Regions:
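Structured, basic alpha/beta domains of bacterial-type, RNA-associated proteins
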Residues: 3-150
Length: 151
């Protein structure tokens, strides 16, 4: 039996369109920032082609693509990292910038979990962010404000 492929376009993830777009955008920003995130398997499968398209967009370095990156990610920090770091890392690679590794099942609801990460990722990317958080924890909020004001 053959069925017509109507409404087979994309996974809805049981969310409204705006919620789904926001979810994908937030996950893309987290993936770019930390270069590895743990999420459910269906979300990782939706995120993989989106992340690959973002890297491909960043590889063609022109104003139009820069604006498209900023529009898609809603973050100039993430857009700059894609343009300056990730696009240089993957300039010899034609595609397949991310990989999905199955990571068992979540305790509580038994959801299949997965780790999505960039191929040849920078292992230090996650640690750098943790170090800055730890140094900021040690200081009082007033000291942090003074430090930022002197920059």
């Amino acid at each position: 039996i053959y069925i017509m492929r109507h409404k087979f376009g994309y996974k809805k993830l049981n969310r409204t369109s705006e919620h789904r777009k926001a979810l994908i955008k937030n996950m893309l920003n987290s993936l770019i920032k930390y270069e590895q995130i743990t999420t459910t398997l269906p979300k990782a499968k939706v995120l993989k082609p989106q992340a690959d398209k973002i890297i491909t967009l960043g590889k063609k370095n022109n104003l139009q693509n820069t604006r498209a990156l900023i529009t898609k990610l809603q973050s100039t920090v993430s857009a700059n990292k894609v343009k300056n770091t990730l696009s240089k890392r993957y300039e010899s690679r034609k595609g397949g910038y991310t990989r999905i590794i199955k990571a068992g099942f979540r305790y509580g609801d038994n959801s299949p979990m997965a780790v999505i990460e960039f191929v040849d990722r920078d292992v230090k990317a996650k640690n750098i962010d943790k170090k800055t958080k730890e140094t900021n924890k040690d200081k009082s909020p007033n000291e942090q404000i003074k430090k930022e004001a002197t920059k």
